[in-house]
Amino acid sequence: MNQWEELQESVGFDFKDVELLKQAFTHSSYVNEHRRENVKDNERLEFLGDAVLELTVSDYLFNKYPDMAEGHMTKMRAAIVCEPSLVEFAEAVHFSKYVRLGKGEEKAGGRTRPALLADVFESFIGALYLDNGIDKVVTFLERVIFPKIDAGAYLQTVDYKTQLQEIVQRDRDVLIEYDILGETGPAHNKAFDAQVIVNGQVLGKGSGRTKKQAEQSAAQFAINQLTHR
C-alpha cells in the first residue's frame, strides 16, 4: 500500500482522481524543485476549500443553533476556521506526514509549520469537494469538526489577546508587543504573519487573513504554550 492509498483509507474516501488528492498535499516549494514533473501546488485548492469549509460550517451552525444571533454565529465560525483550529484538525488526521515539500522547506521545518498545515487542511477540503461532492465533505466534517461543535468547544469564543494579557499579568506588570512579520499571497487572498513578544521573549506566532486575525492567532498559540508547560 502506497502513501496515497494509505491516506484514502485513513480519511475513509476513495478518490476518482488521485492526482487531485496529491495536489492537495503539494506545497509550492515542491513544485519549484520538480518542474519537469509538471505538478501543481495546492494554492488554488486551498482557495476553494476555504470557501467550502466556511459554507459547510455556517450551514451546520445555522441548523444546530436556530435561535443564535448572527453575530455570535459569526464569532463561532471564526473560531472554528481560524488557523490554530485548522492545525488541530489536520494533526488529528495526521495530514503532515503526507505533505510534499521541497528540500529547503523540509529542512526549515515546514512540515510542522502551522500556516502550512492549515493550508493543507483547506486544500484537502477543496479536493474532496471537487472529487466527491459536498455530501462527502460534510461526512468528513462529521468525523473531524462537528463533534467538537456538539461538545460546546466553541460556545465561549474568546478574545485571545485579552486572555493572554490576563494570564501574563496575574503576578506582575509585563510588556506585550505584537509584530507583523510580513504578508504573502495575491491581493485577493493575502495572509499576514504575526508574533507576540512578552518582555522581549517571542511566545507565539500565527497567521491570518487580516493583521488582527494574525495577532489573535499568535496570542492563541502563546496561550497554548503557557498552559501546556
UniProtKB/Swiss-Prot annotation:
Mg(2+) binds at E46, D119, E122. Its EC number is 3.1.26.3. The active site is at D50, E122. Coiled coil: none annotated. It catalyses: Endonucleolytic cleavage to 5'-phosphomonoester. GO terms for cellular component: cytoplasm. Keywords: Cytoplasm, Endonuclease, Hydrolase, Magnesium, Metal-binding, mRNA processing, Nuclease, RNA-binding, rRNA processing, rRNA-binding, tRNA processing. PROSITE patterns: DS_RBD, RNASE_3_1, RNASE_3_2. SMART domains: DSRM (SM00358), RIBOc (SM00535). Pfam families: dsrm (PF00035), Ribonucleas_3_3 (PF14622). InterPro entries: dsRBD_dom, RNase_III, RNase_III_dom, RNase_III_sf. It comes from the Bacteria. Its cofactor is Mg(2+). The keyword Hydrolase applies. The keyword RNA-binding applies. GO terms for molecular function: double-stranded RNA binding; metal ion binding; ribonuclease III activity; rRNA binding. It is found in: Cytoplasm. One of its GO terms (biological process) is mRNA processing. Belongs to the ribonuclease III family. Homodimer. This is Ribonuclease 3.
